[in-house]
Amino acid sequence: MDWAPRQIKPSIEVVDLRKDRMDFILLNSDVSTANAIRRVILSEIPSLAIEIVTVLENTSVLHDEYISHRLGLLPIDSTLASEFEFRDRCQCTDKCAKCTVDYTLDVSCNDSNSRLVTHFDIVPDDTHSKSIYGKNLPMPIPRADVTNFNGATDGIPIVKLKRGQSINMKLTASKGLGKFHAKWIVANVNYKMEPRFSFNSALMEQLSSDEKAGIAASCPRNVFKYTGVRSENPSFLGHSDKTFKLDAGGLQVVNKLECIYCDECINYCRELGHKDLIRIQPDESKFHFTIESTGSIPPEKILEIALIVLEKKLQDLQSNFTEAQSRTLGSTTTAHHREGPRAPQPSTPYIDLD
């Protein structure tokens, strides 16, 4: 059995790039590839997160477990996560600077009536070797040393202390993957297939202006707009990433990406007696992605790492198939050589991944 490679060349077009968000279009692809990219981003991107909390003192109103859970979900700068070892694969006996980062959270409220403890109060442990990473020691983000933040108002809240209360904890962060626990997930990612609209021009000519306006009003997402004026080009008025205008006797598609396939417009047309007036189908070769980073890794870097991880997985799959095929063919040849002539056997399936 031969597997012929598909003659498609996927490409990526970046639509919008911000500090913590990225919108891009995956072109000339299919659902399996789009879903693979999404799953890799959610579960296969390595990052750092607080895994162990040693409570030395806690007189706040929150239980130890509540505070530990909040600390575990704090995003930590993971741009250097690839330089760390997974703790269960490290050669050390317990933990070391190659697989963990140690922090201290020691805050007391003595002077004021209350004190809000935020992630800015977390400091590197003095016993941790800072010489390995220098100023790039992974810290909870946003980092107080590189950004202009007010620690009292802009930090991520952990717990509020009243006068006389205090907390003292030792924190240990380690490397992990999103498939192990949600605290290691680096981003939320989603995609949608681009909808394709088509109108029956013959039936559209039979509609009145009020009926066309009713079609536009039936959409809860304002995908359509009725202008009452037919354009000179009845097929396309313009094309961009988020606005696509398809004219049908004054009825235009102006926000196609807002379509949620609710079929309200189609149901309205059926009430008018024209069930085939509008057809909406997803384009299974064009996918609009949105990556919302937690801040631990920039979104463009997340996509880059995801593609590298996906490529490595495909290489491993090809290598394993080739190895299994060679092992199977080798054992068959050896058996024939030892036992002499045998009756014809069915040919071994051949899988070509090149």
Stretch-by-stretch model annotation:
Residues M1-D354:
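Protein-protein interaction/assembly regions in multi-subunit complexes
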